[in-house]
């Protein structure tokens, strides 16, 4: 299946499908005429006498140096090679595929001036599985993601490295094995390919998609913990949330209320319970998870706009002029990444407190210490809770905003930068930590509910426990725990736990 992209209106749902499924993409042929028109205009400018940045001049601080017409192709090639300065481990294939798809969307708007053959090469590389090796570090998020995108482009011109069928090869060899030929870049094409926010945006989108799946699963594990602790569902009453009015809180409260519907555990303590109120980690879940959902939705709107944006420089305007601007500055992406980081941090923080509540017999309303029937002889989930605390603390440190930092670069020509790329990249580690925290809560919540037998939980939560137990059997005696934690985290990450819940209960990104 090939996804057909309509530049300017590609929805988040399609972007997530590209990220998760690695499907090939193509630009809608209806956009080809606009692409070719802009390319023809760039060719005219390159043949003329007027200096235009990046077409017949140097780059950055060297923009005042005029380049002879005969050196334009060399200029573009040198640009790519000199900017391949990335360091660190290669970005994953699914991230690079999304970067390439986003670059197609941007170029497909017909304002960048690249020829159609550049577009078709990217499409063919995605179809045949030639994935450029892009090091993870080296971008400050303005002037675009220069180093990462230079590594992408290097493979296109037969330089650098690329992955093909599991092998890491030279760019030329990877293209050759796939039956493709490298492109010789024309005027502005190198600049159009490396100038842009596609790396930062792809990383931020990956963080967004992972965080959204995590918050949906955190609502499930939060409901499990509520039932395991014999907590009240009264704070999830619809009218309470309507009186405050925040959409995320309303949606989170509705989800929790529905997930707990029909629980025999809840019915068992509707009367005679001397506790007046539950701790905040139980009672305030809709307020915290709902606030996180709201800022994820805000970030989603920003990133959907950016994914469809033209962010290179200069741009070919509708009147045919090539005008220098600054759409490559990734400040919107940096802000969105910081928002996502805050949400990821707080989802994990309140989840961790529920884990701590369930393993503490002074708080868990009758559950045995560390959820083991033989405390002392067995330690149960004691250290699983400690691990969740370590991960929570690490995420708090990583949640410091990246966008508040800036440093002058390129001889002060690029004197304010966004730091969007590493601000977005940290989301991969943060969401991995979050998945592990929520996975641990799934283990504690499920075991806590099982220890309430013969009382039973709701039908929805019973499906979640069954999905968990298909991979992780109930803890009766101490055993090697690392495999349990890994399996539980994977069930969060791959959507297994959220996938068993009936449609319409868990909130979507698009409110």
From Swiss-Prot:
Chief subcellular location: cytoplasm
EC assignment: 4.3.1.3
Q: Where is this cross-link: 5-imidazolinone (Ala-Gly)?
A: 142-144
Post-translational modification remark: Contains an active site 4-methylidene-imidazol-5-one (MIO), which is formed autocatalytically by cyclization and dehydration of residues Ala-Ser-Gly.
Q: 2,3-didehydroalanine (Ser) occurs at which residues? A: 143
Q: Name the InterPro entries on file.
A: Aromatic_Lyase, Fumarase/histidase_N, HutH, L-Aspartase-like, Phe/His_NH3-lyase_AS
What GO terms describe the biological role, i.e. biological process, of this protein? L-histidine catabolic process to glutamate and formamide; L-histidine catabolic process to glutamate and formate
Keyword set, alphabetical order: Cytoplasm, Histidine metabolism, Lyase
Q: Which family does it belong to?
A: Belongs to the PAL/histidase family.
PANTHER family, A to Z: HISTIDINE AMMONIA-LYASE
In Swiss-Prot or TrEMBL terms, this protein is called: Histidine ammonia-lyase
């Amino acid at each position: 299946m090939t996804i057909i992209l309509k530049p300017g209106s590609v929805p988040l749902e399609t972007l997530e499908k590209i990220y998760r499924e690695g499907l090939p993409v193509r630009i809608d042929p209806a956009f080809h005429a606009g692409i070719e028109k802009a390319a023809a205009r760039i060719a005219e400018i390159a043949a003329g006498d007027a200096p235009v940045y990046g077409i017949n001049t140097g780059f950055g601080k060297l923009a005042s140096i005029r380049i002879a017409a005969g050196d334009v192709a060399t200029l573009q090639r040198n640009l790519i090679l000199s900017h391949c300065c990335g360091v660190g481990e290669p970005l994953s294939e699914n991230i690079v595929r999304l970067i390439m798809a986003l670059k197609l969307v941007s170029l497909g708007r017909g304002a960048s001036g690249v020829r159609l053959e550049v577009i078709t090469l990217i499409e063919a590389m995605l179809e045949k599985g030639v994935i450029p090796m892009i090091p993870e570090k080296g971008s400050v998020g303005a002037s675009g993601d220069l180093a990462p995108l230079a590594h992408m482009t290097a493979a296109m011109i037969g330089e650098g490295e690329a992955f093909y069928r599991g092998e890491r090869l030279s760019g030329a060899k990877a293209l050759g094995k796939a039956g493709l030929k490298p492109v010789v870049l024309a005027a502005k094409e190198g600049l159009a390919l490396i100038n842009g926010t596609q790396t930062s945006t792809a990383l931020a989108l990956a963080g967004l998609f992972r965080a959204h799946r995590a918050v949906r699963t955190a609502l499930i594990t939060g409901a499990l913990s509520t039932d395991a602790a014999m907590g009240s569902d009264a704070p999830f009453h619809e009218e309470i949330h309507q009186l405050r009015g925040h959409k995320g809180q309303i949606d989170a409260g509705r989800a929790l209320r529905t997930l707990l519907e029909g629980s025999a555990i809840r019915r068992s303590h509707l009367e005679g319970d001397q506790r007046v109120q539950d701790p905040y980690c139980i009672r305030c879940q809709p307020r915290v998870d709902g606030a996180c959902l709201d800022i994820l939705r805000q970030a989603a709107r920003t990133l959907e706009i950016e994914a469809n944006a033209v962010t290179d420089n200069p741009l070919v305007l509708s009147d045919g002029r090539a005008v220098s601007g600054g759409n490559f500055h990734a400040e919107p992406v940096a802000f969105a990444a910081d928002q996502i980081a805050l949400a990821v941090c707080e989802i994990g923080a309140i989840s961790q407190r529920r884990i701590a509540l369930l393993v503490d017999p002074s708080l868990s309303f009758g559950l045995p210490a560390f959820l083991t029937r033989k405390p002392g002889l067995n330690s149960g989930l004691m250290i699983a809770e400690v691990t969740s605390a370590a991960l929570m603390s690490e995420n708090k440190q990583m949640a410091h905003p990246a966008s508040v930092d800036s440093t002058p670069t390129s001889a002060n020509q690029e004197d304010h930068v966004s730091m969007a790329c590493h601000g977005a990249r940290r989301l991969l580690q943060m969401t991995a930590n979050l998945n592990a925290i929520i996975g641990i809560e799934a283990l504690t919540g499920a075991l806590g509910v099982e220890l309430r037998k013969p009382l039973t939980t709701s039908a929805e939560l019973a499906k979640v426990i069954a999905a968990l137990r298909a991979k992780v059997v109930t803890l009766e005696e101490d055993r090697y725990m690392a495999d349990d934690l890994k399996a539980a985290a994977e069930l969060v990450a791959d959507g297994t736990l959220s996938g068993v819940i009936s449609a319409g209960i868990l909130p979507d990104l698009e409110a």
